[in-house]
């Protein structure tokens, strides 16, 4: 097993879980963050904010100094909130000029760029150039950070322009409990990974109202159809929906209280929009992406009533208590599929 030096940008749950997995695979892992408490915690063998008093089963190092974190790393992983990607790319760019022949970039950030409505790999390309885009791999799939950290069996997908590099990254992560499977759809993987979070808010809200698997299944069915419409308009491949990054990730995010987006949706009914947003302390990707989703739906003139309705809730235009009633009307108006 080769010992690679790996830099992970981020000290959150996902960054720490992936760092732990890579360290267990025999690599040297450095995490970079801006929170001194989290950095110190990681250096003492814990990340109590996300994993309580569970000690790491392998060694991780963390620092607030970006130059130290990157060092001579062979791999740089972006594991930060999507809202921070712009500024972090600008900082990282300074340290990449002499690494053109070797460094491989890995993106696990979820979202669609708010300004351009483009997938995040295109943002990375615009910031860092075509050379690094050709050495970029994006990972996504059904994977709660806590379960990856606890070494529960997990399967996700990886995609990128260079299939050889994609396979190399897959092997970097693969173990007897964690598997990354290559997929040839850069657009689809990222669109599904982003929009499923908004659907999870919708499902969580409806579940808070009805506590019904029947209702959840109906909203999921219609929501998945809408995601597929949007993805195809953005040039995703039709079959990607059946992959781990498609239906697998959608099911995970839309069916469990472990999902921040699902829980956020439940809180909308209990507390209302304003209070839920004010009290929320975690990254809720579905909330971050709803304006972008609205722009895409408008741009391509897509009929997406479930998405349009949950967007109205988040905009404060539709009472959360009216959302489920609106969904019921949509169910009753469904036409026979031909």
UniProtKB/Swiss-Prot annotation:
SUPFAM superfamilies: 6-phosphogluconate dehydrogenase C-terminal domain-like, NAD(P)-binding Rossmann-fold domains. The keyword Methyltransferase does not apply. One of its GO terms (molecular function) is glycerol-3-phosphate dehydrogenase [NAD(P)+] activity. NADPH binds at residues 14, 50, 110, 145, 260, 285. Pathway: Membrane lipid metabolism; glycerophospholipid metabolism. It is found in: Cytoplasm. Coiled coil: none annotated. It holds the Pfam family NAD_Gly3P_dh_N. Gene3D superfamilies: N-(1-d-carboxylethyl)-l-norvaline Dehydrogenase, domain 2 (1.10.1040.10), NAD(P)-binding Rossmann-like Domain (3.40.50.720). The keyword Nucleotide-binding applies. GO terms for cellular component: cytosol. It catalyses: sn-glycerol 3-phosphate + NAD(+) = dihydroxyacetone phosphate + NADH + H(+); sn-glycerol 3-phosphate + NADP(+) = dihydroxyacetone phosphate + NADPH + H(+). The active site is at 196 (proton acceptor). Catalyzes the reduction of the glycolytic intermediate dihydroxyacetone phosphate (DHAP) to sn-glycerol 3-phosphate (G3P), the key precursor for phospholipid synthesis. Belongs to the NAD-dependent glycerol-3-phosphate dehydrogenase family. This is Glycerol-3-phosphate dehydrogenase [NAD(P)+]. It comes from Malacoplasma penetrans (strain HF-2) (Mycoplasma penetrans). The lineage of its organism: Bacteria, Bacillati, Mycoplasmatota, Mycoplasmoidales, Mycoplasmoidaceae.
């Amino acid at each position: 097993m080769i010992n690679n030096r790996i830099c992970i940008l981020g000290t959150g749950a996902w960054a720490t879980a992936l760092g732990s997995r890579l360290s267990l695979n025999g690599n040297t892992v450095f995490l970079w963050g801006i929170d001194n408490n989290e950095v110190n915690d990681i250096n003492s063998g814990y990340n109590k904010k996300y994993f309580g008093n569970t000690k790491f089963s392998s060694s991780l190092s963390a620092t607030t100094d970006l130059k130290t974190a990157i060092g001579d790393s062979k791999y740089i992983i972006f594991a930060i909130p999507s809202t921070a990607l712009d500024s972090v790319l600008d900082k990282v760019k300074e340290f990449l000029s002499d690494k053109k022949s070797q460094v491989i970039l890995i993106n696990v950030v979820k979202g669609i760029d708010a300004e351009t409505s483009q997938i995040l790999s295109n943002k990375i390309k615009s910031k860092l150039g075509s050379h690094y885009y050709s050495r970029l791999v994006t990972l996504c799939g059904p994977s709660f950070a806590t379960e990856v950290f606890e070494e529960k069996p997990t399967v996700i997908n990886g995609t990128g322009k260079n299939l050889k590099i994609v396979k190399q990254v897959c092997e970097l992560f693969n173990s007897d409990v964690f598997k990354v499977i290559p997929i040839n759809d850069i657009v689809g993987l990222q669109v599904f990974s982003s929009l499923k979070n908004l659907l999870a808010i919708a499902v969580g809200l409806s579940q808070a109202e009805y506590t019904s698997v029947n209702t959840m299944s109906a909203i999921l069915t219609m929501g998945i159809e809408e995601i597929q419409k949007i993805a195809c308009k953005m040039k995703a491949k039709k079959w990607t929906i059946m992959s781990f990054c498609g239906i697998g990730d959608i099911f995970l995010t839309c069916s469990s209280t472990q999902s921040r987006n699902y829980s956020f949706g439940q809180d909308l009914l209990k507390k209302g929009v304003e209070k839920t947003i004010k009290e929320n302390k975690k990254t809720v990707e579905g909330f971050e992406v709803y304006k972008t989703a609205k722009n895409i739906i408008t741009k391509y003139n897509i009929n997406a009533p479930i998405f349009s309705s949950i967007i109205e809730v988040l905009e404060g235009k539709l009472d959360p208590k009216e959302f489920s009633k609106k969904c019921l009307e949509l169910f009753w108006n469904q036409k026979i599929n031909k």
